[in-house]
């Protein structure tokens, strides 16, 4: 990823950075409109997810997470920007004439060939079942349910590791540090998702954050008591509690939010690390 730093002409561009090489030129048959209603509101218009709203209009790119074009070689034609995710996408031209978008694997360049199937080489960008991969393989775009398409490790820079295979299940270490079991018949893509340094790029100003649909975040300690439990006081006052709480009074630090009786509880061998 080539980062272009702005010249220090104005305060808003003094610390800004953009990608100078990756552009967006989507194909008409691989995009569709999406209706963003609410933006953090429920059916009654009440805010249910804070700090969301606004943002630039987007066209959705149809990404091939299933990789079900078996044993057909494809060639990477372009590497494009996708406004709906922080990872880049690749336009693939397959040998049968079909064109699809996939997530851009780290290190893949224009002209590389990829393929998906059961007996394909362990090469970056190839998709194959976990049962055909050797231990220690770095993977992304991992299926949870067979045939449903990849659902895990799809963000920029995400990578999981295949650490064991026993019986009908494979043991994976996910990017969060969680260790869990997944069926060996599920597919995954070899390699790491590209655009690794996206979290190190500085937007430079608040307006760039608003273009992404993210609203400002206000600290509770500067609010009034009617708006937040941390609010109130004369001048710069402490929160007045032993531990921080959420705007609704629940503990903000250390509280577990996962449901206890979830179906996948028996599949998780080690909880994610913070």
UniProtKB/Swiss-Prot annotation:
Highest taxon of the lineage: Eukaryota
Keywords, comma-separated and alphabetical: Chloroplast, Plastid, Ribonucleoprotein, Ribosomal protein
Main subcellular location: plastid
SUPFAM superfamilies attached to this UniProt entry: Nucleic acid-binding proteins, Translation proteins SH3-like domain
Database matches in Pfam families: Ribosomal_L2, Ribosomal_L2_C
SMART domains on file: Ribosomal_L2, Ribosomal_L2_C
Subcellular location: Plastid, Chloroplast
Gene3D superfamilies in UniProt: 2.30.30.30, Nucleic acid-binding proteins, Ribosomal protein L2, domain 3
Region spans: Disordered: 1-21, 225-274
UniProt GO molecular function: mRNA binding; rRNA binding; structural constituent of ribosome; transferase activity
GO biological process: translation
Keyword check for Plastid: yes
InterPro entries: NA-bd_OB-fold, Rib_uL2_dom2, Ribosomal_uL2, Ribosomal_uL2_bac/org-type, Ribosomal_uL2_C, Ribosomal_uL2_CS, Ribosomal_uL2_dom3, Ribosomal_uL2_RNA-bd_dom
GO cellular component: chloroplast; chloroplast envelope; chloroplast stroma; large ribosomal subunit; plastid
Sequence similarity: Belongs to the universal ribosomal protein uL2 family.
PANTHER family in alphabetical order: LARGE RIBOSOMAL SUBUNIT PROTEIN UL2M (PTHR13691:SF5), RIBOSOMAL PROTEIN L2 (PTHR13691)
Assembly and interaction partners: Part of the 50S ribosomal subunit.
Protein name, as recorded: Large ribosomal subunit protein uL2cz/uL2cy
């Amino acid at each position: 990823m080539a980062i272009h730093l702005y010249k220090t002409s104005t305060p808003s561009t003094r610390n800004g950075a953009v990608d100078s090489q990756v552009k967006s030129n989507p194909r008409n048959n691989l995009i569709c409109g999406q209706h963003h209603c609410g933006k953090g509101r429920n059916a009654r218009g009440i805010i249910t997810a804070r700090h969301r709203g606004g943002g630039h209009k987007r066209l959705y790119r149809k990404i091939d997470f299933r990789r079900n074009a078996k044993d057909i070689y494809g060639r990477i034609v372009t590497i494009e920007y996708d406004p709906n995710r922080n990872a880049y996408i690749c336009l693939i031209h397959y040998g049968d004439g079909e064109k699809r978008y996939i997530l851009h694997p780290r290190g893949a360049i224009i002209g590389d060939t990829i393929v998906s199937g059961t007996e394909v080489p362990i090469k970056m960008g190839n998709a194959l079942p976990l049962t055909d991969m050797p231990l220690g393989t770095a993977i992304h775009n991992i299926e949870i349910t067979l045939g449903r398409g990849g659902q895990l490790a799809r963000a920029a820079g995400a990578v999981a590791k295949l650490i064991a295979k026993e019986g009908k299940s494979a043991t994976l270490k996910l990017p969060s540090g969680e260790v869990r079991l997944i069926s060996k018949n599920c597919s995954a893509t070899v390699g790491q998702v590209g655009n690794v340094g996206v979290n190190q790029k500085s937007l430079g100003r608040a307006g760039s954050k608003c273009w992404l649909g993210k609203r400002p975040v206000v600290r509770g300690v500067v609010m009034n008591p009617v708006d937040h439990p941390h609010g109130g006081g004369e001048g710069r006052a402490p929160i007045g509690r032993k531990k921080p709480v959420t705007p609704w009074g629940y503990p903000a630090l250390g509280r577990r939010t996962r449901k206890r009786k979830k179906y996948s509880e028996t599949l998780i061998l080690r909880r994610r690390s913070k």
